[in-house]
Amino acid sequence: MQIRSLMFFVLACLLATPAVAQDKAIAWQGKGANGETIDFQPQALRRPAVLLFWATWCPYCKALMPYLQHVYDAAGKDKLDVYAIDFKDEDGDPVAELRERKQTFTLVRDGDPIAALYGVKGTPGLFLVDVKGDIVYKRISGDAPEKVEVALRDKLGLPERP
């Protein structure tokens, strides 16, 4: 009888819980490659945005970033923003690293406070934010770069890469 009552209580709690809305992106300010202020306001986006939390020393970031560049190139700069938020990177030179890798993302330097806002503790972290400010994709730890590219293309309505 007690188990039956417990099951009923759990079921009632589950049914009474409202549907969970998608996570909302959090506004932030950061410094760009030349020290300019970058003001990310998710409720006022004109196009979707990818937030990539990375570090120059991170081999997983290095593996993921070319796939993200393919997505960025396919979407076009007028249809997608990509912010490469450098964090946990005291000794690296993110400007030189992006240049060397031929990656054209918007660099955000010293992004540790932004990573903390999003609960990112390791690299790479990746979020796709739609024009309503909803986080519609999060890279799950361990997702292969190819899988991330496919997911982003799907969410952005882009064709698969040939």
Regions found by a protein language model. Give the residues of each.
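Conserved redox-active cysteine motifs that mediate thiol-disulfide chemistry
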Residues: 53-70
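Hydrophobic beta-strand anchors of alpha/beta hydrolase catalytic cores
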Residues: 50-51, 82, 126
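Positively charged n-region of N-terminal signal peptides that target proteins for export
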Residues: 1-5
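Thiol/disulfide oxidoreductase modules built on the thioredoxin-like
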Residues: 47, 97-103, 111-154
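Conserved segment of the thioredoxin-like fold in thiol-based oxidoreductases
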Residues: 24-25, 63-66, 73-111, 123
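Sec/Tat signal peptide C-region and signal peptidase I cleavage site
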Residues: 17-21
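Bacterial N-terminal signal peptides
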Residues: 7-16
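A short beta-strand-turn-helix
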Residues: 27-49
